From Swiss-Prot:
Native species: Saccharomyces cerevisiae (strain ATCC 204508 / S288c) (Baker's yeast)
Catalytic activity: sn-glycerol 3-phosphocholine + an acyl-CoA = a 1-acyl-sn-glycero-3-phosphocholine + CoA; sn-glycero-3-phosphoethanolamine + an acyl-CoA = a monoacyl-sn-glycero-3-phosphoethanolamine + CoA; sn-glycero-3-phosphoethanolamine + (9Z)-octadecenoyl-CoA = (9Z-octadecenoyl)-sn-glycero-3-phosphoethanolamine + CoA; sn-glycerol 3-phosphocholine + hexadecanoyl-CoA = hexadecanoyl-sn-glycero-3-phosphocholine + CoA
Membrane topology: Multi-pass membrane protein
Primary subcellular site in the record, as a coarse category: membrane
Protein name (database record): Glycerophosphocholine acyltransferase 1
pH effects: Optimum pH is 6.5-8.5.
EC number annotated for this UniProt entry: 2.3.1.-
Length: 432
């Protein structure tokens, strides 16, 4: 009879309820883009347990006392059924991974050609909805979110960047969805969503140079998660008719001025919730993978690239992380100081969103010019080097040909000179 290890059961039970274990559960299909395919240990263990489970089902119990423990048998059967489900799910995911990998990585040019008109259409259609049908804009935002986010998850997971999905901008998007569909009556949630979207998300476009590159799914999705949520909050507060807003979003009916103290309190509370979850599931539980370089986070990227020479990075652990966390918090408070203006003046809020959109568009234009311009320069330089190398290879051969030709010319002249001398001698003898 197949004997179960209680430690294995406990480990599997704990993993089944962990959010990060769901990500690690998919590890057998790790990225083919940045590394070779690795047949992960999760799949090997699951397949081994499935084989044991198949043998267990074919064998009858050898001991009579096993039949007197239905609880143990039910627990074993449930656990093995879970392993069976995991293996079948992994097989389905692997079967789906091959065409998706071809679409998003190997033959991405076709997808980018199709995504270019899709992005253009959405830019104009979003503007049309905001002006003509504002009551449907939050619905369209939700649809786009659940279209783009699975793509973002898949592409980030394949490139081992899926820990970036736990960043604050995604948390704010989830808060917006919670307000729209579950807690539309929550004044504090709307106040926090408005402050986060018009504060942290909008200024992130300027600070971190989000680029509206309309053929790129990755860059367009980044602009979507930073620009569209403040547009949704703008439409809900400034664009909806009062009667509809009272019925659909009662939490958005606030005075023309924000209570700064309450706003700081609520946003700090939501920020604390996010930081606690982030540091527990990512910083602590996955610290080994982060330190080994298997996974990348925003903190690791900043401290190893843009701010690697910053004095705070060179401090002993955990001071760099503490300084980074506090800096994020004060940055969030600083960026929401102007939210009182965006609440009070509709035109000012519209102009601010327009500036953010134009800033992202300018970054996108800069990307196109710099990226393709630099690639063209590199191609020209490469061709120039090839021509120079070819000329250097041909130079010795040409010199040899020229030297041979000069020798032949000298021989030819000498022969002609001798012939002329003989002819002159014969003529002189005849004359004599």
């Amino acid at each position: 009879m197949y004997k179960l290890d209680n430690n294995d059961i406990d480990d599997e039970t704990n993993n089944s309820v962990s959010l990060t274990s769901l990500l690690e559960f998919l590890d057998p299909i790790a990225s083919k883009v940045v590394s070779k395919y690795y047949h992960g240990s999760h799949l090997s263990k699951a397949e081994q347990k499935l084989r044991n489970f198949e043998g267990f089902r074919r064998r009858k119990p050898h001991h009579e006392h096993d039949s007197h423990h239905p609880h143990h048998l039910n627990r074993s059967r449930s656990f093995l059924q879970l392993e069976d489900f995991k293996v079948r799910a992994l097989q389905r995911i692997r079967n789906l991974d091959k065409p998706l990998d071809s679409i998003f990585f190997k033959n991405s040019s076709r997808l980018e050609k199709a995504f270019y008109p899709f992005t253009l259409f959405n830019i104009f259609f979003i503007g049309f909805l905001m002006g003509r049908f504002p009551e449907w804009f939050h619905v369209y935002y939700t649809i786009l979110f659940f279209v783009l986010m699975p793509i973002r998850f898949y592409t980030y997971y394949k490139t081992k960047n899926h820990y970036f999905l736990a960043d604050f901008c995604y948390f704010v998007n989830m808060l917006c969805l919670l307000f729209i569909w579950i807690f539309p009556y929550s004044y504090s949630l709307f106040q926090s969503c408005f402050a986060f979207t018009f504060g942290t998300l909008c200024f992130a476009v300027i600070t971190w140079r989000n680029s509206l590159v309309i053929h790129s799914i990755d860059k367009t999705t980044s602009c979507f998660i930073h620009i569209i949520p403040p547009c949704v909050m703008y439409v809900i507060y400034h664009g909806l008719p009062l009667e509809y807003k009272i019925e659909r979003f009662p939490g958005a009916i606030i005075q023309s001025e924000l209570d700064i103290k309450k706003n700081i309190l609520w946003t700090s509370l939501y920020y604390l919730v996010w930081q606690s979850l982030y540091h527990y599931f990512i910083t602590l539980k996955k610290s080994s993978k982060i330190k080994s370089g298997e996974r990348m986070t925003s903190f690791e990227y900043l401290t190893t690239h843009q701010f690697k020479n910053f004095w705070a990075v060179k401090l002993r652990s955990p001071w760099p992380m503490i300084i980074y966390t506090l800096s994020q918090y004060f940055y969030q408070l600083f960026t929401m100081l102007l939210c009182g203006i965006w609440i009070r003046y509709k035109l000012a809020a519209a102009l601010f969103l327009t500036i953010v959109f134009l800033w992202a568009s300018h970054n996108g234009a800069t990307y196109y010019i710099d990226h393709y311009g630099k690639n063209f320069e590199k191609e020209v330089d490469r061709l120039r080097l090839e021509v120079e190398n070819l000329q250097q290879k041909l130079q010795p051969d040409s010199d040899a040909v020229i030297s041979d030709a000069s020798v032949n010319d000298k021989d030819y002249l000498n022969v002609n000179r001798d012939e002329d001398f003989d002819d002159s001698s014969s003529v002189s003898s005849k004359s004599d």
